[in-house]
Amino acid sequence: MGHVGAHAEILEGGWAEFYGNLLERCPMGYSVSVGPFVPWRGVEGVGEARCGGCKRGEGLRVSARPLAGMGGVPCRLMRFAMRMDGTLDILRGGEVPTAGALAGLLAAEGQALETLCRAAQRVRMERVGANVYLRGLVEMGNGCRKDCFYCGIRRSNAAVHRYSLPDEEVLAAARFAFRNGYANVAIQAGEDGSSAFAARIERLLYAIAEATRGELGVTLSLGEQRQSTYQRWRDAGASRYLLRLETSSSALYAALHPSDAVHSFEGRRASLRALRDCGYHVGSGVMVGLPGQTLLDLANDLLWLRAADVDMVGLGPYLEHPQTPLWARRGELWPRAERLRVAVAMVAVLRLLMPTINIAATTALQAIVPDGRERAIAAGANVIMPNITPRGRQDDYSLYERKPLAADAAEDSLPSLAARIAALGCRLAVGERGDSLHFALRDSPAGVW
């Protein structure tokens, strides 16, 4: 099985793209390999290889050895396992791998994905503990001035039934959350930049604070606004704000939005900077599996989130909606199971990259498989957002096809949720706010937006 002069090509970050069996590292720490792609038969082989990373080891004698528990596995998987272990070592050391190395982690499947998730869960337990915090999601309205090509409530969708919850229904949902131990609400709506909307949210925030003695945490997800509006809402009691960038690639962003001032990539980034300046716990996130998106794009998304120094992240699989322009490109999409797998890997890698942030197990994961949120929690997520919007309105907040709906009585679902989370070795932290530890530890308003 040995081959003299076999080739090992070193890619970005020192990771080898192997043409053959996986072998031990060269004296400078680079992996080298010999031989063609063949199934591993458990037989040791000897060969010579030149390591292209350190330019040493020409004629180096190396031996091919089976990795523990991988007998009968094709060499390409053993090859990947060694690369993954090296990247995990870099992350555990507190360093930042290259985008190419992170993309390799995002390709993990099967046993490799389980290994990645276990590593992330260990870090999560060590750094932020076993708690999973609740955010009661209130979908306040589905009118939107944006016309994003992927979204079911986009401005041009004449088929959607528009609604706006009365203030009393929003307050009732907040009281419900407070009474039932959620400790937090997340108020979400389509984007409205009017002064009337800004004033309405300000009034609601003061009313929620009065109704809950200022104890209920409030997260807002209301799109791009003026910095003065963000500040008004912060002063009225909102402490967290989620504004998803959706992708850190300006080219991909342009393919997802109309080309106008309302849909500016730089404007989105400027809004995130404004939120930080106003003192919010800043959250962002991305979609996984967009048409034309690559694993390298997603790896760069992870690096952007880290560079931006966000306090919380919500990410999930892109789910197509038939009343959107991107529906025409559904033939280009990864299978839904693949989008789920990569989204779970994204959660795990993000936990390793940013150990102290809050990461949400998003509803979009549940839209693919019933235990989608639980898979994210097993990969390091520590926030879950049950939908407490009045049931009659949830159908109308249709961002994507086959969106899961909450139980008829939201309070009845908490014991079941707690049991499922406990089965993962975690604890549903009823009555606890669960503010981002990352925010508490920050010394300065860092972040490259």
Task: Tell me what each language-model feature is.
Residues 30, 51-54, 75-111, 178, ...:
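Auxiliary Fe-S-binding modules of radical SAM enzymes
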Residues 135-138, 158, 186-198, 256, ...:
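Glycine-rich, proline-tolerant flexible connector loops at the mouths of alpha/beta enzymes
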Residues 192-195, 219-221, 225, 271-297, ...:
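Conserved strand-turn element in the central/C-terminal portion of the radical SAM core barrel
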